[in-house]
Amino acid sequence: MIQYLKCDNGFKETEQYDFSCWINVVNPTKDDINELVSHFNTPDYFYEDISDIDERPRFDRDDGWILTIIRVPNRVRTEDNQDPIYTTIPLGMMLKDNILITVYYGQNNVISNFINWSNQKKN
C-alpha cells in the first residue's frame, strides 16, 4: 500500500504525490514496487533488500538515491494470545533530492506513532 502524506500542520493522506509529500509504503505489492520504480526511478533491488527479514542496518547509494536501512520493533502475537513477542524488522528510507520514501514489510508502530504524535503536536 502506497500512502502519500502531505506535511501541512501535521500529516494528511492525499491521493496523489506532490513535492511536499512523504511516501510511506507498507507491505508493497509487485504493482506498488513497479509504480515506484517507474515513477521515481528508484533502484528495484532496494525493495528486495528491505524485504529480507534478516537484512542488517546499513546504507547504500545508487543513481543519486541514498538507502538507509534500520531495524525497528515489530509486535507479534503468540498463538495462545498471551503477551506479545517483540522482534525487529527492516525499515528502509530512500532519499533523493526532495523525495523521501519509507518502506517496510509487516506491522510497524514506529511510523504510525510518529504520524499520530505529529498530528497531535500541531494543536
Regions of interest found by a model, annotated:
Residues M1-N123:
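Peripheral, non-transmembrane regulatory/ligand-interaction domains of membrane transport proteins
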